[in-house]
């Protein structure tokens, strides 16, 4: 730009010698405009960098630097946050189209203007005036919220032995936590759909036949028309540490009736800043794993960009001519989770279920004209998707015949799916099946978790694990590598035999989820403790690290613990046709090593604790807005655990002579929930890990709970530190054993049913009281 200005000035000076004096004013005006443009171009494209961390420009990164994260000072973070807030405010008003471009914290370039140069020259992208570009410097933040005390009834399995004669109350204990009000995060549906239609991409065109009246709906000024047909719910989020943002996936459905009868269900991706403000037109610069080359010492990789928000282009089987069957097409129950991939980067994956089909047979006898008739069998199966990887076409979703096969066989004449999507780009996916590619007609409600020890051993996650069913515990182990899912249809998956059984109490073919279904993922407590210990010294305290290390030392060798939230479905239990609430579950695993190698040993699992229904003090919304809470469904569904961190918290303790500051450890868990299948809500739970593990002898002292209060911590006896806690039930599959391992689950469901009954009776009494009050008011008015 400077060279351009200098050359332009020289040109005008030389020309000025040949022109009259009257033209000088015009020349000066032109020069002023050029100078002004140069100032705008060099100042409105803002680059933020930390001058203390300047790295040589290179596109080669070794694995050692991939996990490094360094935040800027709080003052610098606040300053940049103000810029982002102003940027988003301008973008929503007079200056639409402004982008925020975020490079990861571990990006190898940081020197002033290097990000701009890399973006323009290496990535061949264009920057516009007022674009904001920076390398992330934000760290995770806990918001300031009000909390109320809540109690959770938890049932243990009694520590083994014959529990068939023991009453549930003997196995129950109470956990005390603090819970925030629900914070709604639903988007503006009119804006979401308007952007979807205006972008007019291939994915929009593919699904437009399912909602042909969208344009007319958006042209109407009545938002009730939009709200009647479109719903957003089932939100699941993760914190992207390298980018300083929350990434959320949710369902957006279209219906002609209500939220209970969708026609099509799509997945929507959006970003929020660390204060949970939604971000629009944000471009993340992510590693392009599919162009990565690996040598013996290092990996060379390029970067690509993804702009949020947008509808996730997930390949889906659909047929608009089959809508009268009562089923819907598309993505159901999406869950998002971060994994560490083989390149050492954190990468978001999703788990969801979706309708699809497989060829059941080819009928040559009734095909006619020497052609066979292709018959399909319909399934609703579980899939994994890699949000930052892509594939071309739907070759691994549908068993569609190839072109030469179609010449010899007849497809269904009503098959609208013969449209050619073979060149469309989608998110990379893969179906998850039981061993030997076995599948039920309906596969859903799997509860996912990751193995922290596996990551420590290999440096990345090789597998993802699922509780396939809680009753008669069954656990699947599925490979995470996407290598078997080709980008193009240039191979097959004949050697991919699906997931394998990691653990089964009963080695049989009796599959059934029972009343307890999958809800959130399960979080590894061992990793939670390690994450606290790995924090910088400014984020931890000496006594905090000592306490955390002492807990790790007390845990038996080779033990891992997971905590999550399932959901029970109680039908006709006293309120509504179906009631859903969260149920906390605790899963424990012990690795039993062989004489030579623990890796070749056996893994024993145990569902040690299950809670009854948890309402967490959350306001319940009626299924139909103009009717009562016990009509239709009564729904509070846990969707995902957004984050779980251990923080230092200072308490001032008054003594006779002075005030003493005491540093305590307090954990904050963020869970996403859905109410009435129409909301996305955040709820913060404070002190759950404290109650369960960190302070087993103090009965939640950090949660301001009176130690004399009835009910004590289930871990006051340090049950999770018991070496013999996990036993090998899979080797003894008697009826008595089965009753033992399911006893806590049965008790939790029994008390959940009681919760529903009491809830219904309470509402009846309240309704009667309110109706009497209304009648008295009418009498007085008369």
From Swiss-Prot:
Keyword Membrane on entry: yes
Record's note on what induces expression: Expression is regulated by SEF1, SFU1, and HAP43.
Its EC number(s): 2.4.1.-
Topology within the bilayer: Single-pass type II membrane protein
Gene Ontology biological-process annotations: cell wall organization
Entry keywords, A to Z: Cell wall biogenesis/degradation, Glycoprotein, Glycosyltransferase, Membrane, Signal-anchor, Transferase, Transmembrane, Transmembrane helix
Chain ranges on the Cytoplasmic side, renumbered to this chain: 1-26
Molecular function via GO: mannosyltransferase activity
Comp. bias intervals (Basic and acidic residues): 76-96
Stretches that traverse the bilayer: 27-47
Pfam families: BMT (PF12141)
Residue positions the entry lists as glycosylated: 445, 648, 699
Top-level taxonomic group: Eukaryota
UniProt-annotated stretches for the region Disordered: 66-96
A cellular component term, taken from the record's GO annotations: membrane
Extracellular face of the membrane: 48-782
Name by which UniProt lists this protein: Beta-mannosyltransferase 9
Organism (species): Candida albicans (strain SC5314 / ATCC MYA-2876) (Yeast)
Designated gene of the protein: BMT9
